[in-house]
Amino acid sequence: MPDSDEVDLGPGTLLISAPMMQDPNFRRSVVLLCEHNDREGTFGLILNRELDVSLGDVLDEYVTYDPPLYMGGPVQRETLHYLHTREDIPGGVALPGDMTWGGDFEAVQQLAKGGDAAPDNLRFFLGYAGWGPGQLEGELGEEAWIPAPGAAEFVFDTDPDQLWRAILRRMGGEYAVLANFPDDPRMN
């Protein structure tokens, strides 16, 4: 496992929850970090928790584009966030791995109404994962998370139900072994 002092926690980093994590909010989750600094802490979005609601369930104006929503995290679950790979949504925060977080919501609405938006280039989240200053570093020191570089393919092209295992397998070595860790080791 990488030394927590050597880990880059910058935007675009993925956090893969350790197999033994039992917190139901983060168990077998993959979090994309969007913002991290020593003064304010860390902001991220859980990538692999699809909700049983769609965008049209929370925003009436999306009748032609109604993708599933994802739980971005347990903090402020009433807030809407989005990741995309589109160049026609200005104002977002560019993330490594060819992704953008946020941007001009009016442009998003126009794309959705015009039928130009698709789940393979625009994904919506309710809430976010947040850590106070130093909190995430402490959790990394406890080996609760495995950091990895992010890429748009993990957000838009990989089945969310398989994402946790897929990233660990791709990391290879000891991480690939963790991908096969049973959901409940007591049942093994």
From Swiss-Prot:
GO cellular component terms, A-Z: cytosol
InterPro entries: AlgH-like (IPR003774)
Pfam families hit by this protein: DUF179
Gene3D superfamilies registered for this protein in UniProt: VC0467-like
Assigned protein family: Belongs to the UPF0301 (AlgH) family.
Listed HAMAP family: UPF0301 (MF_00758)
Name of the protein: UPF0301 protein SRU_0495
Organism the protein comes from: Salinibacter ruber (strain DSM 13855 / M31)
Taxonomic lineage from the root: Bacteria, Pseudomonadati, Rhodothermota, Rhodothermia, Rhodothermales
